[in-house]
Amino acid sequence: LNSSTTVFNYNKDAFRKAGLDPEKPPQTWPEVVLAAAKLKAAGVSCPFTTSWQGWTQLESFSTWHNTEFATKGNGFGGTSARLNFNSPLHVRHIENLANMAKQGLFVYRGRGNAADAPFYSGECAMATASSSTYATIKKNAKFDFGIAPLPYYPDVAGAPQNTVIGGASLWVMAGKKPDEYKGVAAFFNYLTNAEIQAKSHQRTGYLPITMASFEATEKSGFYKQNPGTDVAVNQMIRKTTDKSRGIRLGNFVQIRAIEDEELEQVWAGKKTAKEALDSAVKRGNELLVRFEAANK
């Protein structure tokens, strides 16, 4: 029920000081580079950063560009799927980020959501992150901020496509008493109530999980009163393809850890983008081979 997707947050006050239009965030990755350079020239020590680097820069990046992350429809076609995020487009993107890092335009702040706090503290001016950062930014930021769609490469056919969902799930375990299941059902019914979901979405930035809660939010005027809060929804409701409808792979938590390890080698200047992505794909595919063998 805490479902989110990836968005682009930016500091409008920092944009103003750098001579950038606060109502025109960068739409493409080349524009991100130009904006970052102007922000750095204006004295910003961390022009751009990212949280959840594997999710934002590889997984959502892939679906946003309608490009395979893995074969077999990103794993939906069976356990024989293999990773494919070392394509020329992926390598180009990570190379660009590495070049930004060398110039001080991209500053890596750590795994997971470690880059969230440097954004809402005002240290970092632009960040790719979860849409669920909305509540924390609104509560903590002492500056005017904006939410925009993920940047894309304009020369890639079909981009932008759609982003992928992230978050967590609630599971009901077997072996409990009937009365306990009645309580679980009542709780789930409460959580999925359109009014409750709409309020949660508006408060947190997590996605509304039903059309009724989305429509209630839209009807209330919330999106017009809070520009950018509909970005996550609009990125998700675009038409999907077999390359963009999501990712389903075995041992995915371990694969994400490999992504982090290899990308960190790039940011540290110890590997090229191609070396790191080739290694990540090779190591990840070894896990997928084991998963396939264990689930035949």
Where are these regions (language model features)?
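A structural signal for short loop-to-beta-strand junctions that line the ligand-binding cleft
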Residues: 1-15, 46-47, 157-163, 242-248
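Glycine-centered hinge/linker elements that transmit conformational signals in sensory
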Residues: 33-39, 78-109
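Extracytoplasmic/periplasmic substrate-binding proteins
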Residues: 57-60, 67, 91-183
